[in-house]
Amino acid sequence: MVRPLNCIVAVSQNMGIGKNGDLPWPPLRNEFQYFQRMTTVSSVEGKQNLVIMGRKTWFSIPEKNRPLKDRINIVLSRELKEPPKGAHFLAKSLDDALELIEDPELTNKVDVVWIVGGSSVYKEAMNKPGHVRLFVTRIMQEFESDAFFPEIDFEKYKLLPEYPGVPLDVQEEKGIKYKFEVYEKNN
């Protein structure tokens, strides 16, 4: 079964997503709660959502918050020989992770698949054929960054006018404005 892939990311105006292994902006509690809700809440009883992330993204999560709770966590790494402490699975590549999900043991447990970073994992997911959604929080300010979100190809990806559970209005926390957007491609 080919499942839609969902990438979720917060980006600054200069497309920054990270700085020194952390977020480039101060912690935004409501934005973080949106991430938690979107990636955790499953619409199917008895199933869990699954998050896929690169090794650096995994280690950027404070240890007390690893694994991301109430979600199946897959870490991607070509170097690691076994899943890092707390991770449920390790895969060498995104393709391997997606194959793993189709394993009979996992396939019936997984509802929605979320890609949560970093840059190269997002890029690979965005270039995959098929149904891909991008849940983008647009932080309406520039922040110095050393990790960036790949360019969105607007020929392929269309901005949806609305999406269930995604607020439409501009949000503000700590003097920082941001808005939630959802893009989709289906080819």
Swiss-Prot record:
GO terms for molecular function: dihydrofolate reductase activity; mRNA binding; NADP binding. Substrate binds at residues 31-36, 71. It holds the Pfam family DHFR_1. GO terms for cellular component: cytoplasm; mitochondrion. PROSITE patterns: DHFR_1, DHFR_2. InterPro entries: DHFR, DHFR-like_dom_sf, DHFR_CS, DHFR_dom. NADP(+) binds at residues 10, 16-22, 55-57, 77-79, 117-124. GO terms for biological process: dihydrofolate metabolic process; folic acid metabolic process; one-carbon metabolic process; response to methotrexate; tetrahydrofolate biosynthetic process; tetrahydrofolate metabolic process. Residues 4-185 form the DHFR domain. Pathway: Cofactor biosynthesis; tetrahydrofolate biosynthesis; 5,6,7,8-tetrahydrofolate from 7,8-dihydrofolate: step 1/1. Belongs to the dihydrofolate reductase family. This is Dihydrofolate reductase. The gene is DHFR.
